[in-house]
Amino acid sequence: TGGLVHIVEQNTANYPHYCDWGRPFGCPAGQAAYYGRGPVQLSWNYNYKAAGDALGIDLLNNPWLVQNDSAVAWKTALWYWNTQTGPGSMTAHSAMVNQAGFGHTIRAINGWVECDGKNPAQVQSRVTKYQQFTQLLGTTPGGNLYC
């Protein structure tokens, strides 16, 4: 989100990549409809489906609600933060409340494309922004900042 600046993913060339046609529910809103939106940049048709099912909102057919309705955007962000592990072993929420470290939040949210040396510049950018936020809040960032 660029530090919570952008509501939608900025790289439009990526938009068509977030449709997994192997899922039984497909991509009814169109192949390019499931790009990153909201505070955690919810992406992929299967995440829109799961978030929508959990929240009682048809996000599979109406993914634009995440960018057009701030309440929906924050609900999806909190849903992902609290329930999804991504390629990691814990949710981002569990990582923070159990003091496992900020690096586990990166792994839970973007581990497939950033962790394990896949995009060290992006990981560093996230860590730097996190350190700036913790400084503004007058707290320490803790350990295990990287994934």
Predicted stretch roles:
Residues L78-S89:
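Flexible secondary-structure boundary motifs
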Residues V5-I7, G88-G101, P141-L145:
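Surface-exposed patches in mature extracellular/periplasmic domains of secreted proteins
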